[in-house]
Structures are given as structure tokens and as C-alpha cells.
Design a protein with these regions (language model features):
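Membrane-interface "cap" regions at the ends of multi-pass membrane proteins
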Residues: 1-49, 62-67, 79
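Helix-loop-helix junctions that connect adjacent transmembrane segments
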Residues: 7-12, 52, 128-132, 160-285
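Select transmembrane alpha-helical segments in multipass membrane proteins
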Residues: 15-25, 60, 91-104, 136-140, ...
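Transmembrane helix-loop junctions in multi-pass membrane proteins
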Residues: 34-40, 115, 147-153, 279-280, ...
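Hydrophobic transmembrane alpha-helices that form the core helical bundles
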Residues: 40, 53, 63-141, 145-149, ...
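Juxtamembrane helix-boundary/capping and inter-helix hinge elements in multi-pass membrane proteins
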Residues: 43-48, 75-79, 88-94, 220-228, ...
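Generic alpha-helical transmembrane segments of integral inner-membrane proteins
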Residues: 56, 60-64, 104, 108, ...
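TM-loop-TM module centered on a large, flexible mid-protein loop between adjacent transmembrane helices
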Residues: 84-85, 91, 123-124, 128, ...
């Protein structure tokens, strides 16, 4: 090894392929919302046909945003994603405000909420006292941070594994719901007046589709961002659209719209119990926990890159430490530690 190679500063490693990028898109979007959102959309729409239409329109809107992101990603294939795009288009002030919001508000709030929800489901499933909630939440965040600290390739493996595992209960619920369910799907009223307008139902679906844009934050670590990013975003959104619509149809085959609205967040668990017996609810609980791990991993992986990019530009306190890349793992470990620490607080 020459002196030039020894003294060369560490750089982020391009280890993310198409499968890992797809897993980031699907894993960050397909969280607990797949189980929780259908009743909320149904309540807002007031009718099964309009509820399904809301999911379709939400998919179209998300795809429009995804195609826009692809154009920007090909134009600016760098680490930082939307932060970089805002900087290039609107200037450093707008980008700074966006990055500051993600670093100190959105990122910690989202990661902390996901960890808290994981610990709640974990304690409920295994009968653990509630005073262990903070410990379990910290443990799952520490686990995700550790995997991300080992390397982006390992974080990608975890994302693929979590995405595959979370699809198992969703696929089982969808397949057996369509197979064994005998309910009607279209033109069924909830039996109560719609709780909001159709536009609110569409907005509710957009929250379920949210998260796909974060994959652009790791564009600088993709092997070929010009090809991988567009394929991951478009392919991921098409897959997610199919999953959401199929899971809604499956639920309608098992539960009536009025039952879905009345059961609320428990609708998927009750549907699983009808299909698989007493252990059906546990299946959904495990699916939710795996979904949360995938979401946590995706957010720590992508948001830490925004922190890193801001620190490179000396826009954060302690930028010298936050912009450091570990020589062995080629990852911004300190940026991830900051996110997890703020999330726990």
C-alpha cells in the first residue's frame, strides 16, 4: 500500500445493489400501516369501492412523486437525497432548514416512535411488564445501529431479510383471505356516514405510501445510482401498490366495511384470527415487529447520510466528528449514533 493510499480519507463504499435498494423502498413504506391504515381509509371513504379507489389514486400520486425523484436522482446521484436536490435547486438555506428538520425533529421522532411501538407490541406479545419498555426500545435501536456500523452491505442484508420476513404474514393474510373469505368487496357501505371527504381518504393512503423518497439518501453508495435508483423507486412503488390493494380486498373478503371501521387498528388481527385461529393475532404482532425493524433500519441508514452530508458542509455542531467515516466499515457511524441518541431522548 502506498503512502497516498494510506493517507487518502475514507469514503462511503458503493455496496448497495438493486435488491437492497428495493428492500429499502419496500421496507420503509410497508410498515405497520399495511395492518393499521385500511380501517382509517375505509372510515374516511364511507364505502368499500371509494376506499379501494383512494388506494389506487394514492398509488398514482406516489408514482408521480417517484418519477420526479428518479429524474433528480439521475441528475444528482449523490449521498443526501432530497437534501442535495433542494440545495441544487433552491440553494443552501432551504436545504439547511430541511436537513435540520430531519436531523433534530422528524428523524428522532420517527425512529423513537417506531422503537416505542416495537417495545409495546413485544411486551404485549410476551407478557413483559411495561417498565421494560424503554430498555427494549433502546435495545432494538442499538441492534439496528450496530448492524449499520458494521457496513452498508450488512445493513442492506438486514433490510432484505426484514422485508422478506414482513411479507410472510401479509402474503398469508392476503392469500387465505382471498381464498377462504366469502364476503363481497365492492359497493359496500360502512353503515355510518363517511367521517371525512374522499380527499382525506386519499391523504390517508399517502401516509401509508410515505417513505419511498428516503432511498435517494444512499444514492452515493449505490453501485450504479443512475440505473438502480429509478428501478428501485418505480419497481418498489408498483409492488407496494399491488400489496396494499390486495390486502384491502382480502380484508373485505373476511370482514365487512362496518366491522373494519369498528375494529380499527385491530381489524387485521381479528381477520387473521378468523383465518388461522387463536394464533392469527400473534402472526400479525410478529409481522408488525418485523416491519418496525425494517423501518428502523431504513431510517437509520438513510437519515444518517443526511446528517453526514450536512456535517461535511459544516452545517451542524460537531461537524468534524459527524462527518467522520469509519475506515473499516466505510460508514458514518457517529451520524447514526447522534440519530439514535436523539431518538432515545
Amino acid at each position: 500500500m502506498t503512502n497516498d493510499e494510506t493517507n487518502r480519507p475514507a469514503e462511503l463504499k458503493k455496496d448497495i445493489g438493486l435488491v437492497s435498494a428495493l428492500a429499502i423502498v419496500v421496507g420503509m413504506v410497508l410498515g405497520a400501516g399495511a395492518f393499521m391504515k385500511p380501517p382509517a381509509v375505509m372510515a374516511a371513504a364511507g364505502d368499500s369501492t371509494w376506499a379501494l379507489a383512494a388506494w389506487v389514486i394514492g398509488a398514482v400520486f406516489s408514482m408521480a412523486g417517484g418519477l420526479t425523484l428518479c429524474e433528480l436522482g439521475v441528475l444528482y446521484p449523490r449521498t443526501g437525497g432530497v437534501y442535495v436536490y433542494l440545495d441544487e435547486i433552491y440553494g443552501p438555506k432551504v436545504a439547511y432548514l430541511y436537513g435540520w428538520m430531519l436531523t433534530f425533529i422528524f428523524g428522532p421522532a420517527t425512529i423513537g416512535a417506531l422503537a416505542g411501538y416495537f417495545s409495546s407490541v413485544f411486551c404485549l406479545l410476551f407478557g413483559i411488564p411495561d417498565h421494560y419498555l424503554p430498555v427494549i426500545g433502546l435495545a432494538v435501536m442499538a441492534f439496528v445501529l450496530f448492524v449499520n456500523s458494521v457496513g452498508v452491505k450488512q445493513a442492506g442484508y438486514l433490510q432484505v431479510l426484514a422485508t422478506f420476513c414482513k411479507l410472510i404474514p401479509i402474503v398469508l393474510l392476503a392469500v387465505f383471505g382471498l381464498w377462504k373469505g366469502n364476503g363481497h368487496v365492492l359497493n359496500l357501505s360502512t353503515g355510518v356516514a363517511a367521517s371525512a371527504t374522499f380527499s382525506v381518504a386519499v391523504i390517508a393512503t399517502l401516509f401509508a405510501y410515505d417513505g419511498w423518497a428516503q432511498v435517494a439518501s444512499v444514492a452515493g453508495e449505490m453501485k450504479n445510482p443512475g440505473k438502480i435508483l429509478p428501478r428501485a423507486v418505480v419497481g418498489g412503488l408498483i409492488f407496494l401498490s399491488v400489496v396494499y390493494i390486495v390486502i384491502n380486498v382480502a380484508l373485505l373478503k373476511v370482514l365487512s366495511p362496518s366491522e373494519m371501521v369498528a375494529l380499527g387498528h385491530d381489524a387485521s388481527a381479528i381477520a387473521a384470527q378468523k383465518l388461522f385461529g387463536l394464533y392469527g393475532g400473534n402472526l400479525i404482532s410478529v409481522g408488525i415487529m418485523v416491519s418496525i425493524v425494517g423501518g428502523l433500519n431504513g431510517y437509520v441508514m438513510t437519515l444518517s447520510r443526511i446528517v453526514f452530508t450536512m456535517a461535511e458542509r459544516h452545517q451542524l455542531p460537531g461537524s468534524g466528528a459527524l462527518s467522520r467515516i469509519e475506515p473499516d466499515s466505510k460508514t458514518p457511524v457517529n451520524a447514526g449514533i447522534l440519530l439514535v441518541a436523539l431518538s432515545f431522548i
